[in-house]
């Protein structure tokens, strides 16, 4: 998925062609106003366009369009190392996992490199919520670097429109008991001149809302029992003299 990544997309494509010479590199341009598409074509990528704005919309179309044994998804901002591609893909191709997750947190590189306020806090909050609801602890739930099997991709109903997609992928994997493997990867911040499209506050609220929606859909008994308990406590409190 790409939106205005002309500064970095050429290097990203070259790096992944080098590490995975037999792979087809797709770039889904999400209404870029710069030269992202032209540069991607010049570097040998297959370029497609998604007019509906938002990373979730892009992923929905990608998963519909592409047939592959292994799907490696990465952002076009050159923050994820192509050198980790085989470590992510091999467990999928060897039948050991259905989704591998590029973990930026365990080795400390995300904390060192990321300069945007509250991103680490938001990641930890979402991890804690997923662990409490679903009982599974991800090392890095918000990473955009993942590999997935064909059965996983083709049975995943994408509901998200935007940056909630990583959270939705994670919850879907846990709820449907897909095999998950965390793979530590090095993280590097965006190069000078490259701008993040993520809005910490508004996108963070959307992620939390998505967790609530999926909690209701995937764990309705637990969700409505919790709501009933809250109302019961409030009712008792209001009824006490």
Question: Predicted regions span which residues?
Answer:
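Short, well-formed alpha-helical segments that are part of the catalytic scaffolds
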Residues: 5-18
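Donor nucleotide-sugar binding loop of glycosyltransferases
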Residues: 5-8, 32, 55, 81
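Short, structured coil segments at secondary-structure junctions
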Residues: 21, 43-44
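A conserved acidic beta->alpha catalytic loop
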Residues: 29-37
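Acceptor/aglycone-binding surface of glycosyltransferases and processive sugar-polymer synthases
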Residues: 51-65, 70, 82-163, 190-205
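Hydrophobic helical membrane-anchoring modules
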Residues: 158-241
């Amino acid at each position: 998925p790409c939106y205005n990544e002309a500064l970095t997309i050429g290097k990203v494509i070259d790096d992944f062609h080098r590490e995975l010479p037999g792979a087809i590199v797709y770039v889904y341009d999400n209404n870029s106003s710069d030269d992202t598409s032209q540069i991607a074509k010049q570097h040998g990528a297959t370029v497609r366009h998604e007019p509906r704005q938002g990373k979730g919309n892009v992923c929905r179309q990608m998963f519909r369009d592409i047939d592959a044994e292994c799907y490696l998804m990465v952002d076009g901002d050159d923050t994820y190392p192509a050198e980790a591609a085989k470590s992510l893909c091999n467990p999928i191709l060897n039948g050991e996992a259905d989704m591998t997750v590029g973990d930026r947190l365990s080795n400390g590189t995300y904390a060192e490199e990321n300069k945007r306020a509250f991103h680490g806090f938001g990641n930890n909050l979402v991890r804690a919520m997923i662990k409490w609801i679903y009982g599974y602890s991800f090392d890095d739930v918000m990473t955009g670097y993942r590999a997935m099997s064909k059965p996983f991709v083709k049975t995943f109903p994408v509901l998200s429109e935007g940056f909630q997609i990583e959270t939705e992928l994670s919850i879907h994997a846990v709820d449907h008991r897909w095999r998950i493997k965390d793979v530590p990867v090095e993280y590097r911040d965006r190069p000078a001149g490259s701008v993040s499209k993520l809005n910490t506050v508004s996108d963070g609220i959307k992620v939390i809302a998505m967790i609530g929606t999926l909690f209701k859909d995937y764990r309705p008994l637990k969700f409505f029992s919790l709501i009933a308990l809250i109302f019961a406590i409030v009712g008792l409190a209001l009824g006490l003299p």
